[in-house]
Amino acid sequence: MIALIQRVRRAEVRVADRVTGAIEAGLLALVCAERGDSEAAADRLLAKVLGYRVFSDAAGKMNLSVQNLDGAGRAGGLLLVSQFTLAADTNSGLRPSFTPAAPPDEGKRLFDYFVAAARAKHPIVETGEFGADMQVSLVNDGPVTFWLQTNA
């Protein structure tokens, strides 16, 4: 599975002009399941997303995770948005191939699993809508962006 995480001051996702998820300071994670991914891969990726130290401590060092945004235990928001295009094969030609992405039904199942697991482990989880045409707005903080990937 893949997650492109961005440290944000705020972010929201809309579907048909309706806000489906919004957060203040925290992480926006674009999430993609690849062919052959499993719940175990989703669990490993979620552990990375929740524990990845991308927020600055008092010394200005990236030493804090979304679960401890300010060093005093305050959790930040986590906005999860499905994005199958992260699995694109761009090695040949000028048109991406999405063959590496999980089929839609499997991608939805794993994304839903990822969201449920996140909600069980983190207090502030918002989402987009799987398979929908979404508009994502964010104020990137830094910018700080990382590509996280786990293998099946």
From Swiss-Prot:
GO terms for cellular component: cytoplasm. It is found in: Cytoplasm. One of its GO terms (biological process) is D-amino acid catabolic process. InterPro entries: Daa-tRNA_deacyls_DTD, DTD-like_sf. Coiled coil: none annotated. The keyword Iron does not apply. CDD domains: Dtyr_deacylase. Belongs to the DTD family. This is D-aminoacyl-tRNA deacylase. It comes from Paraburkholderia phytofirmans (strain DSM 17436 / LMG 22146 / PsJN) (Burkholderia phytofirmans).
